[in-house]
Curated annotation (Swiss-Prot):
Keywords annotated in UniProt: Amino-acid biosynthesis, ATP-binding, Cytoplasm, Glycosyltransferase, Histidine biosynthesis, Nucleotide-binding, Transferase
Gene (UniProt): hisG
Protein name listed in UniProt: ATP phosphoribosyltransferase
GO molecular function, one term: ATP binding
Class of the enzyme per the UniProt entry, highest EC level: transferase
Length: 211
């Protein structure tokens, strides 16, 4: 049976709609009373695992799920050994550098050498500032990253932005974009090749919905 890792959170609703459009119903995950983390489609064709977004590529990489849906941001941050099969074109957001609106720094290259940047996307932030040849200290924060500059812990943050409302409410402005992110369909590379007859028809159906 096909096993699919589906992320909790912002991508869940659109992921459920996508699978419904190809004949797989995992809508029970949307029921507020649901406590199950694994459900089987009523047609008994596939089962879905409801996991944290950061864990989706882990379940796929280790072969516990043949397919998964994950944000492009996590693929760049975690660099898992998975096959990236399709851009699903939902869940749009962007990875941005932001500073307080009152900051004298209007561009990342204006940040002071060895300045501090708070982020939960440590690898993405390191790579970005490395390309700028700007030595900064990346402070890993996994809660409200916006508090970094507010409390004076950091001069800037690197974080995902969708509407920009949270930044605005906390007095922050974007000064650069690292990359844009949407949901992607991923697969376990070996499982995909060995079970092509089972998996590929579903992948084709998903791709057809995107065209």
């Amino acid at each position: 049976m096909l096993t699919i890792a589906i992320p909790k959170g912002a991508l869940l609703s659109d992921a459920i709609k996508l699978f419904q459009s190809i004949g797989l119903d995992f809508s029970a995950f949307l029921d507020p009373k649901n406590r199950q983390l694994q459900i089987t489609d009523p047609t008994n064709t596939a089962k879905a695992l409801l996991v944290r977004a950061t864990d989706v590529p882990v379940y796929v990489e280790y072969g516990q799920a043949q397919l998964g849906i994950v944000g492009y941001d996590l693929l760049l941050e975690k660099t898992p050994t998975v096959a990236n099969l399709a851009n699903l074109k939902f869940g749009y957001c962007r990875m941005s550098v932001a500073v307080p609106a009152s900051s004298p720094y209007k561009s990342p290259v204006e940040l002071p050498p060895n300045g501090k940047v708070a982020s939960k996307f440590v690898n993405c932030a390191k790579k970005y500032f490395h390309t700028l040849d700007l030595p900064v200290e990346i402070i890993p924060l996994y809660g409200s990253v916006e508090l970094g500059p507010i409390t004076g812990m950091s001069e800037a943050i690197v974080d995902l932005v969708s509407t920009g409302r949270t930044l605005k409410e906390n007095g922050l402005i974007e000064i650069d974009t690292l990359f844009e992110s949407t949901a992607h369909l991923i697969a376990h590379p070996l499982s995909y090749r060995l079970n092509l007859d089972q998996i590929n028809p579903w992948v084709t159906k998903i791709r057809d919905t995107l065209s």
